[in-house]
Amino acid sequence: LIEVTGKQFAWAVRYAGIDKTLGKRDFTLVNGDNELGVNWNDAASHDDFMADEIVLPVNTPVSVNIGALDVIHDFYIPEFRMMMDAVPGVPTHLWFRPTITTDSMRLITKNPAFDYVLACNKLCGSGHYNMQKKIRIVSMDEYLKWQSEQKSYYATVVKPAIEAGTFKLPSTENSPLHESTLTNTESSENSGAKIETKLSTGFELVGANKDGVEN
């Protein structure tokens, strides 16, 4: 399970940790040190990690929660013929199955520099072109090795700041804690919008959120 959040002009990528559950977010906690408003009081957030690139295992269903912080963006992977709006305050969701690794696609295209790329397909401002994030589709062994090397944001940034007395966990008793997006594919399947489409472009789209599908 991963969460991809659009902002001017970049993508923030958050992975669920070994518990396979993303920590909750609360818009009242958004500030310069916590742009996603992650609720660090939620133990589920303690093993989540942020990533500079999107790494996915081949032939494995991937659940993606999609959102935005400012204006409307669009989660768009052109090689997959797949896109979904990223709307502030309106969570969207996709799950799909990558079927061709990056290395295999480089051989197929005869382009050793080929990379899958997440782009924004909405004109979101002057820095729109900068909204590109590299995607690597790898074997499961490669993915597990990469995953084991990632460090949780809570353990490396938040906890040391708390221990140093430079950061204090806020009280959230009176604030509306919420899950930033759907947390599993069950909600998607129960919405009646599940579809199955097999393309020859390196992925298999197997589901979308209740608001519809763009592909």
Positions of the model-derived regions?
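Non-transmembrane, membrane-proximal soluble domains of secreted or membrane proteins
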Residues: 1-215
